[in-house]
């Protein structure tokens, strides 16, 4: 585990992601530093790990999912043979934090060739609410695909980034924009990246771009239907969220209804909360 953790921290983008997380999130559980996590792992013993495992088996919620051709009676008999007792386990997968008008900023110099700029935005939407799919489409237009604004305008047309993308996590209300850049382009890249979001807020995108984005999302959903991990993940979300998680056909139908106005409303709810810059020096 320590070797894997150290390897992750040696990845410049992973390191920058974690530093932005520390600036953005209020909850300490989402702001764990490398040194804290490493010390916690070092402090674990065979006895403490075994005790934690027994506590988990006795008290935590356990969900079993089976996919494929199997005998339900045999599965039921096997599960009953485990001797699990009833438990009232509650799992919270949605994290919400209020927006703060105080912009958090961080910077570090590292001996790497490429600088990394990260922008963290607060999104008030939650998984399964009415803004869910408009936010997904908005992120696709912004930086989720090769035709997106960040890639086309910032990387290809302006030549300001080697790598650029955006990621949306509705379980934590967090939109991340990040780019690998030359350090002298920091201010220009930051301004232009933010301007791509401003364009979406103002509705400066074409119907062709909107349809391209929807088509990419449709394809992703269709591919997930043939992926066992995706099917189990969706079943787990249904188990936890109930009606908040629509079925496949429901997603497609709702996706078709997302229009320019819905995307503009979603984009206008997104506000800059944190900025992190890792300046590469050689």
Language model features with spans:
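His/Glu-based metal-binding/catalytic segments typifying zinc-dependent metallopeptidases
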Residues: 61, 88-149
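Charge-rich, well-structured scaffold segments of protease-associated domains
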Residues: 1-91, 126, 156-282
């Amino acid at each position: 585990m320590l070797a894997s953790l150290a390897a992750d921290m040696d990845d410049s983008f992973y390191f920058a992601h974690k530093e932005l997380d520390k600036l953005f999130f209020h909850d300490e559980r989402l702001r764990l530093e490398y040194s804290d996590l490493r010390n916690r792992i070092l402090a674990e013993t065979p006895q403490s790990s075994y005790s934690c495992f027994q506590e988990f088996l006795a008290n935590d919620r356990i969900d079993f999912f089976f996919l494929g051709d199997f005998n339900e009676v045999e599965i039921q008999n096997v599960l009953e043979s485990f001797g699990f007792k009833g438990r009232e386990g509650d799992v919270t997968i949605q994290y919400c934090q209020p927006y703060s008008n105080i912009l958090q900023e961080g910077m570090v110099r590292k001996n790497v060739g490429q600088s990394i700029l990260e922008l963290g935005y607060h999104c008030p939407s939650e998984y399964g609410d009415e803004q869910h799919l408009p936010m997904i489409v908005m992120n696709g237009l912004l930086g989720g695909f090769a035709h997106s604004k960040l890639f086309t305008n910032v990387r290809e047309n302006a030549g300001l980034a080697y790598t650029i993308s955006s990621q949306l996590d509705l379980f934590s209300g967090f939109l991340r924009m990040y780019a690998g850049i030359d350090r002298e382009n920091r201010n220009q890249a930051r301004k232009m990246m933010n301007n791509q979001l401003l364009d979406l807020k103002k509705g400066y995108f074409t119907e062709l771009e909107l349809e391209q984005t929807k088509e990419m999302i449709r394809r992703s959903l269709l591919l997930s239907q043939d992926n066992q991990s995706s099917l189990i993940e969706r079943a787990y979300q249904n188990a936890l969220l109930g009606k908040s998680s629509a079925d496949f056909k429901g997603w497609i139908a709702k996706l078709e209804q997302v229009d320019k106005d819905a995307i503009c409303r979603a984009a206008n709810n997104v506000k800059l909360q944190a900025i992190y810059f890792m300046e590469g020096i050689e």
